[in-house]
Amino acid sequence: MVPMNNWRAVPKLTQCVRTLLQGGVIAYPTEAVWGLGCDPDNDHAVEKILRLKKRPVHKGLILVAASIEQLDFLLHDLEPEYYQKLEASWPGANTWLIPHKGRVSPMVTGKHATVAVRVSNHPIVKALCEGFGGPIVSTSANPMGLSAAKSQMQVRRYFAKEALSYATGVVGGRSTPSVIRDLYTDAIIRA
């Protein structure tokens, strides 16, 4: 296997990064399920993901990053104790709700004053974010009401008629998606 820090050596990852940069949608494995991703600053791409999933915009989406530094635009003014809490929990399957202060498109945040963020430890997710140069949208690859895809084949069945770029790889060892918590209250939104 090619080390994922050399994403340019993997043609499928190179194509996925190119798709992200051109405003397209990609499908890729994460820690527990396959995800759909795009450039969070491209409202047309985010809208396509919402349409594919039949997901209402008000629910919001997750941003996933390769490193905490990729999220600095959201974290630079956090109190030190909260920044340290994030550092201690990442990389890993911990998604946190943090205030976005208008720094993220409403297409991503939905009706919320917070945005869900995570630093992944999955090598393919990290490589995609590194190649793209920042965080990407991450949401399970399934239409609303159907189970999240666990394989590329299942994603292709769900979205057979859609033009998506597919990363090669398998999901990580987690049986469930990441836990989502509020950074300030520790309230669990999704276990």
From Swiss-Prot:
It is found in: Cytoplasm. GO terms for cellular component: cytoplasm. It catalyses: L-threonine + hydrogencarbonate + ATP = L-threonylcarbamoyladenylate + diphosphate + H2O. It comes from the Bacteria. SUPFAM superfamilies: YrdC/RibB. Keywords: ATP-binding, Cytoplasm, Nucleotide-binding, Nucleotidyltransferase, Transferase, tRNA processing. Gene3D superfamilies: DHBP synthase. GO terms for biological process: regulation of translational fidelity; tRNA threonylcarbamoyladenosine modification. Residues 10-191 form the YrdC-like domain. One of its GO terms (molecular function) is L-threonylcarbamoyladenylate synthase. PROSITE patterns: YRDC. Its EC number is 2.7.7.87. Its main location: cytoplasm. Coiled coil: none annotated. Belongs to the SUA5 family. TsaC subfamily. Required for the formation of a threonylcarbamoyl group on adenosine at position 37 (t(6)A37) in tRNAs that read codons beginning with adenine. Catalyzes the conversion of L-threonine, HCO(3)(-)/CO(2) and ATP to give threonylcarbamoyl-AMP (TC-AMP) as the acyladenylate intermediate, with the release of diphosphate. This is Threonylcarbamoyl-AMP synthase.
